[in-house]
Amino acid sequence: MIIKSFELNRTSLEKYNFFLFYGENNGYKEEIIQKIVQKIKIEKITYFENEILSSSEVFFNSLTSKSFFEKEKLILVNKVTDKFKNIIDEILEKNIKDITIILDADELSKKSKLRNFFEKEKSLVCTPFYQDNYQTLARLASDFFQKKQVSISREIINLIVERSN
C-alpha cells in the first residue's frame, strides 16, 4: 500500500509491520524512522542488505530467537535493492510475529520488483521520499517558526526558501 510521506504523520502505523522507504530525501526518511522507533519504544537493530544476503541463516535465526527481556524487534535494513525481495517473501511465508521491519532504499525504479510488491500488498507500507520542493520547504519553515512561537511574515519565509535552494 502506498502512503505518501506527508500522510505518514496522520496515519496510524501501529497496525503495519513492514515498511519500504525509498527515495533521495534521506533526512526526511531518517526523521520518519526515528518517529516510528519512538512510538514503538523498542531498540532497533540495524543491518545492511549485503550483510543479510551473505548470511541469511544468521539473520533468520536472530528473527526467530526470542529474548527474555524483549517482546518485539525493530529491524532496520539499509541500502536495500530488489535482491532483498526473496528475504521478504521468506519472512512473510514463515509468518514471524512480533517484528517490525523498515527497509531503507535509495531510488527504486517503477519496474522494481520490491517496490511493486510493497505497493500492491495491503499489509505492507511503501513510501516514496522525493526531494523537497518549494511548497514543502515553505511548509517546513512555517512549521518551524510556529513551534518556536516566532511571528514571521510570508515574505520572509519565501526569502528563506529561495535562499535555501
Protein language model regions, located:
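Conserved beta/loop motifs at nucleotide-recognition and modification sites
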Residues: 1-165
